[in-house]
A protein has these predicted regions:
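...with weaker cross-activation on analogous glycine-rich loops/strands in unrelated enzymes
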Residues: 1-48, 55, 69-71
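Flexible glycine-rich active-site/ligand-binding loops centered on an Asp-His dyad
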Residues: 56-61
Length: 72
């Protein structure tokens, strides 16, 4: 069985995992945790974790959202 289920963008809740795709393909290259209403927690390569507003840069790259089955 799987520990995560895919959820719709419109059903996203705090701490859902956000998967981001590459600018040039549908390949998932980055992850973050969704924080309502428009923020995420993530770590960029070589950096430290931080909370950031979901700017157009990130919104355009959202691939999918996933929720741990115990958080539903």
């Amino acid at each position: 069985s799987t520990c995560f289920v895919k959820v719709k963008l419109t059903d996203a809740q705090n701490y859902d995992v956000m998967a981001f795709k590459s600018e040039k393909s549908n390949l998932i290259i980055h992850f973050g945790l969704f924080l309502k209403p428009t923020k995420m927690l993530h770590i960029e390569e070589g950096g430290v974790s931080h909370v950031e507003t979901l700017s157009d840069y990130w919104v355009k790259r959202i691939h999918s959202f996933y929720r741990h089955v115990n958080m539903g």
